């Protein structure tokens, strides 16, 4: 079973982008390479159980086991030592990536309160898009009653596009709701 968004990419987005940007080969058409979801858990310094909850929630959202990130440097002001676990991240590729992107665009983002579209200024100059989510409750897998603390996350969509314009068109054609 192929993913709905992957089929849309192959059948609609590739021909449209080829025509719009005059690519000579379909291999030159930008595609979504990977999606990285990062959740920084600052309060894991005091209580490591908070990190376990965040890891469990991230696993539910992404469908795969997160990698626990550790502090690179010691910072006395935050009572943080080098090597302490302070977050979790997941890198999605292939089928899971398309499933997550589909779910994000069609289900999760419309559930955000007062949602008027995502910013179209969050591109990094190399065709990658970064999106901040303030609460994990927008994802349908998260049960509202099981949440002990509202946590946000960063979602980075890495594309093979060379420019922000190409990347913006790719994501818009895949259904990303950019603010007008």
Swiss-Prot record:
GO terms for biological process: translation. It holds the Pfam family Ribosomal_L5_C. GO terms for cellular component: ribonucleoprotein complex; ribosome. Belongs to the universal ribosomal protein uL5 family. This is one of the proteins that bind and probably mediate the attachment of the 5S RNA into the large ribosomal subunit, where it forms part of the central protuberance. In the 70S ribosome it contacts protein S13 of the 30S subunit (bridge B1b), connecting the 2 subunits; this bridge is implicated in subunit movement. Contacts the P site tRNA; the 5S rRNA and some of its associated proteins might help stabilize positioning of ribosome-bound tRNAs. Part of the 50S ribosomal subunit; part of the 5S rRNA/L5/L18/L25 subcomplex. Contacts the 5S rRNA and the P site tRNA. Forms a bridge to the 30S subunit in the 70S ribosome. NCBIfam families: PRK00010.1. This is Large ribosomal subunit protein uL5. The gene is rplE.
């Amino acid at each position: 079973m192929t993913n709905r968004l992957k089929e849309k990419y192959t059948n609609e987005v590739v021909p449209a982008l080829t025509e719009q940007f005059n690519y000579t080969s379909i291999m030159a058409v930008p595609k979504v390479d990977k999606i990285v979801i990062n959740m920084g858990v600052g309060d894991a310094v005091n209580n490591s159980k908070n990190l376990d909850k965040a890891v469990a929630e991230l696993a539910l959202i992404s469908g795969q086991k997160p990698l626990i990130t550790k502090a690179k440097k010691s910072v006395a002001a935050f009572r943080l030592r080098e090597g302490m676990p302070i977050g979790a991240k997941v890198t999605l590729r292939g089928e899971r990536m398309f499933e997550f992107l589909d779910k994000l665009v069609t289900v999760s983002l419309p559930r955000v309160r007062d949602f008027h579209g995502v910013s179209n200024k969050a591109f990094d100059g190399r065709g990658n898009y970064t999106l901040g989510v303030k609460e994990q409750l927008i994802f349908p897998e998260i049960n509202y009653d099981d949440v002990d603390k509202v946590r946000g996350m960063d979602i980075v969509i890495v594309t093979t596009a060379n420019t922000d314009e190409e990347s913006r068109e790719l994501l818009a054609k895949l259904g990303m709701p950019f603010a007008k």
